[in-house]
Amino acid sequence: MKIIGIDPGLSGGIAVLENNKVLNIFDMPVMPEGKKNKRQLNSAQLVTLIKENIKFGEDISVVVEQVNAMPGQGVTSMFNFGQTFGAIKGVCAALELPIFFVRPS
């Protein structure tokens, strides 16, 4: 079984594992947005990254860290984080990959 583990923050990452062995590790694909060049998830790059690391028909699961609002984070910051989390869910749905959520320890 192949597992794609995702830490959904913009500074997060993606790990591809198979049979308890790490095959690849990637930084979260991001791109600049707006006049201030703030970072946002590059969903198209995420799709490409996932497709390059799987074969359709393989037994694959995506595991995403499920995080909640954190004290001290602003509304805008949490909204942007939610957008990234939702985009990751959308990419997995579009690729028809089963997605599971785990709480951070």
Q: Where are the regions a protein language model picked out?
A:
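Phosphate- and other anionic-substrate recognition elements at nucleic-acid/protein interfaces
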Residues: M1-S105
